[in-house]
Amino acid sequence: MTNQQRESDILWRHSGPIAPTGQNHIWFMNGTTIFSQGTVNFVTTDWEVKGSGDLNGDGKSDILWRRAGDGRNHAYLMNGNVIASQGTINTVPLNWVIAGTGDYNGDGKSDILWRNTSNGRAHMYFLNGFAIASQGTVGTVPLEWEIKGDGDYNGDGKADILWRNMTTGDGRNYMYFMDGNVIASSGYVNAVSNFDFVIVDVR
């Protein structure tokens, strides 16, 4: 949702293997109807879209970018397909990956959940636009546990973290119910031992 309508929109990026142009384009949707559309800009393909949450709390989805070569993070604050403002957040080493962009502290602004792929540490940035208002560590979790979603599972207005164990063979799923970067409570969901079943989305 990039235009303050209730309907979700579709962000396209031309980044395929054959002559990618880096074009970014948005369809503004009403059901199956594209009621308007527009090109945002062209961005070189070493930049990847890593999220599209509302970073500044204006009710419009923004675009979070990360550069594959050097770990630089950049945000577009959007008004429809127009970049209202933009700025660099910071640069983070490449062994850290963006694992979620939920609103973990319930302030109406999307945040960034990081995971260190070397040691399993999880860390959060609480954002105000492209500024880091505050940050904090969640904890360190063994690498056989993977972050698979960050929905608001208990309805308190704050995004939570869904974990899945993909290594031990039992397919355990576990939830952290978050209050900022603090784990307010946690618990097992169930086990899905058939690894042919994968979590593809959280709603």
Regions found by a protein language model. Name each.
Residues 1-203:
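Trp/Gly-enriched beta-strand/coil motifs that build multi-repeat beta-propeller-like domains
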